[in-house]
Amino acid sequence: NDASSSKIRDLKKAAGLNVSSVSNKSLHDYGMTEERISKIENVLWSGGEPFMSSIHWELMEKLVEMGRTDVKVIYNTNFTFPEESFERAIKLLTNFKNVKILASLDGTGEDVEYLRKGMNYSDFCKNLEIFKEKLPHVKIAINFTATSMGIFTLDGVIQLCLDHNLEFEGRNAILPDRSEMSINAITPEALNDALNRSTAVASGTVLEPVIDKFVKFLRSKYMSVIFDRDLLKKNDLVFGQEEYFEKRMKGLFNV
C-alpha cells in the first residue's frame, strides 16, 4: 500500500505498459474452469479498484450462477468507483452471506484527498453510508495506512469509525525509505501528539484495544528505524541493549 492504485496506473503508462490488457483478462485466461470455481472457499479482491475489474464481475457473477454464495469474500476498496459500478456492486453483494469490506482511508478531509489522487472524501462518506444501509449484513472496516500526513488525522478516522459503527484495521505504515511519506519524516514530539490524540478519542470505546495495539506498533516501528539507521550504527554495544531501548521509549513517548 505504498502508493495509490491510480498512481500505480500512471507509473505503468509512463513506462509504456498496456494497463488495459491486464484488467481485461477473462476467467478462461486464468484457467478458471467451473470445476476449479466450485472448490473456491475464500476470495480476496485487492487493489487497484476491484469493482472496476472485469475479471471481478465475471467470477463473482459466476459464483452466483453456480449457487456458491456461501463463499467468504473480502474486498479492499477506496469506495470511489463510478455510480453504475456502485449500484451493480450492491445488487451483487446482496447474494453473498459472508462479506467484509476493507475501505482504504489514510486520513480525513483535504489531507486524504491530497494523499490519494482522485479521492473525494465527501463521496467516500456518502458511499459508505449507502453501503451500510443497503447491505446491513456486510462488515465494513476502515483500513488505515500510517503516513507522515495522514497520521495527524488518525483521530478523525477513529471518530468516523465510532460515528458509523465501523471496525478499524490499521496494520500498515509507509516504508521508511519513502522518506517524505513515512512517519519517520516527522519529529518524535509531533508523532507523540498525534498518537496521544488518537488514543484519547478511542479511550473507553469498543475501539480502544485495537487502537492501543496499532499505536504501540507505530511507536515500535518508529523507534526501530531510528536505532537501525542512526544510533545503532554509532554504537551497537550501547544502543542495542534492551534496557536503553526501554529508556528511550519512555523518554520519547511517555509510556
Report residues per predicted region.
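Pre-Walker A adenine-sensing motif
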Residues: 31
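Core AdoMet radical
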Residues: 1-26, 37-54, 66-85, 93-125, ...
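Distinct, well-ordered alpha-helical segments
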Residues: 57-61, 84-92, 153-155
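A general structural signal for short secondary-structure junctions and capping/turn motifs
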Residues: 34-35, 133
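Conserved C-terminal portion of the radical SAM core fold
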Residues: 74, 94-105, 121-254
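Alpha-helical repeat scaffolds in large eukaryotic proteins
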Residues: 61-64, 129
